[in-house]
Amino acid sequence: MKKKQFTILVLVLIIVVGIAALILSRNRPYKPTSFVVDGDNWSATVVDGSSILLELNNNSKEWSIISEPETFVSDFHTITENISEFHIIALNDGEGEMVFQCTKDDGSTVQYILALSISRHQKIHLQIDSLSFKECT
């Protein structure tokens, strides 16, 4: 009889430990990922997973946003002597493109696309997974 009780006790302990492990793994705290992407005359830093500091070289250029998606938005634009800095915030998960226009001193313009892929974690946290910044062709 004691062997049977011991076996039942071991099975119950295994089940309890398994359920506890499942609960703990599902309720892990979200840890945002930050990263930096550098390109020719630009740099983007993902901060706390859901916002970007985009720095664009200002040498004889003026930068402006001409189109924004629904998934992210720029809330401020700072201009220093050599850098235009845009602060971009993720609003929703999905993919989107923001179009920037560069106006040079001679009046010519070139457009660039900032493309983001944003995912959602634990229903409330947004994470920027990838970004690219390239000239429109």
Description of each model-found segment:
Residues 1-15:
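N-terminal Sec-pathway targeting helices
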Residues 2-5, 19-137:
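Extracytoplasmic soluble-region selector
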